[in-house]
Amino acid sequence: MAIVDLITSGLGLLASEKDITPTWVEGVMRGSGNLEDGVTVTAVSTERIGEGVGILSILQRVIPTYSGATKAPKTFVVKYPTDDPVQRGTADALVFYIRELTFYRDCAPSAPFKTAKCYGQAIESENTNFTIVMEDISHYRPLNQLDGVSLSDAKIMLEKLADFHAMWWNSPKLPAMQNIFPPILNPTYEMVLPMLWAQGWPNVEKYAGHLLPDSVRGIGDIWGGKVPWMLGTLMEPMTLIHGDYRADNMMFDGDEPVVIDYQICGTGSGIYDVGYFISQSITTDVRRGHDRELVNLYLDRLETHGITIDRDEMWRQYLVVIVFCVNYGVTTFGGFAEQNERGQQLLQEMLLRALYCVADNDALKVIS
């Protein structure tokens, strides 16, 4: 199956659902080898999915009508830049979109977990307008960010994450990959993240201040100044990290894990993905008391790949990660008032999970 270049093919990128025409869909399906000669696309309908969850792209399901019998997919998914100005600004500043396109083209075929098939993609070189056309995998069992992940599912996802990290662990290929998948310590993050934090924290205090654990209230004043040190701490051992390893990007095909959304891929310590996943994708009541167990499960799996682990250093890094990853909840609070009800619930829940994870593990001590 070919992956259609949407620019060189002349089909063009999507700016809104109005651009998803029968001609465009037919070009993608035929160019990717999924539509037979003599069969055409006569109509299309769309439905938006994942609206309001505070992420960085628009996702729409496309339902084509074909002129006759075909092996072409009955539905597929398109992804293009968000229309939320706060989220788009974040994505542009941190150069997220090209990472996912590169991952699907170069890395997905060898990844240890399933990903959606890619039918077409492209990004404009002079800006961050992009489009990805992907397999619709909505029939798989999804995990849910708001409900949280069970311990049993979390253990499966952490073991599979270790398999993923092991593929690139201290790989000599990583330096050449860093022009697309930047190191976690880089000038852009050092400059942008403190600014985004400063913009988001006042909204945290306004909308969720009464909910914050007392022991971590001081994080608002100290986090921004610690960004270079935290990121530097998380540079080694180096591997390819997913960057957004959370429940809404995970599902199961039977017993087989499926992972999507590679916009935030980078290079750094694999414990980054571990801390982000545990601190924000598992509810506080389920996670509490299991942090070390889950971290050790991940490390045990790494060792099965012949990787030597300094467990004390990995635990120290875990504490740094869970402090650092509070930023996901804080920076997205800049657009809290504009979110729908689920979006607001998700932003608030992710923030509080992260903060309670910090409080439960007394993690602020590592950056104080």
State what each model feature region is.
Residues 46-196, 270-271, 311:
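Conserved ATP-binding subdomain of kinase catalytic cores across diverse folds
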Residues 98, 102-118, 209-222, 226-242, ...:
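N-terminal low-complexity, intrinsically disordered segments
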Residues 140-242, 343-368:
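ATP-dependent phospho-/nucleotidyl transfer catalytic cores
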Residues 51-69, 77, 224-270:
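Active-site acidic catalytic loop and adjacent metal/ATP-binding pocket
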Residues 102, 264, 270-306, 322-343:
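Active-site activation/catalytic loop segments of kinase-like enzymes and analogous catalytic loops
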Residues 155, 300-368:
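Helix-rich C-terminal or lid/interface subdomains of diverse kinases
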Residues 2-44:
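Juxta-kinase regulatory segment immediately upstream of eukaryotic protein kinase catalytic domains
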Residues 4-5, 254-258, 272-279:
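Short acidic (Asp/Glu) and glycine-rich catalytic loops that position anionic groups and cofactors
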